[in-house]
Amino acid sequence: ILAAGGPENIVCTVKEPTRETSAKMVNDPSVRMLVATGGPGVVKMLLSSGKKAIGAGAGNPPVVVDDTADIPKAAKDIIDGCTFDNNLPCIAEKECFVMKNVAYELIQNMLKNGAYLINAAQVKQLEDVVLVWSKPKKEGEQPKRVINKDWVGRDAKKILAQIGINVGDDIRCIICETEFSQAFVQTELMMPI
């Protein structure tokens, strides 16, 4: 940042962050804007601070790819992002919304970068492995699909093996074409799918 002419101390971090250090930063009069990710408590603290704030809890960040994109670069960047730490970080790419006229090219380039494309039947099989039904917390509440915590952060190779697909170590993530309402789009999986 300094080499590019930016100001000193524009980005700072706390060596050992705690709720107390977060509260100090939030309440410090010299801090004019806050940005944080975390659980609902952290986000609530930021948004109720009275300061400009950007807060995000659990996320399922989308990527939008249109026909102005450098498709080979977009594919590489998406795969690199969603496979970093097996897609655990809430900032990593979780799903792509792609214009039809570039979808085929994007998929082909994703395959070149370590993705494995599964079909609709395999998507259904995979749902039964990586998702479970929640137990309703209140009377009348409907169960919904939630992540199977046994598969959080697992390698794509191990996940695919559960549905009978054996791949090499070069496969870093699993991709599929699906509808917006499909559970993989609506649920933060925290695994390379």
Model-derived features: where do they sit?
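Short acidic/glycine-rich loop or secondary-structure boundary segments that cap or lie
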Residues: 182-185
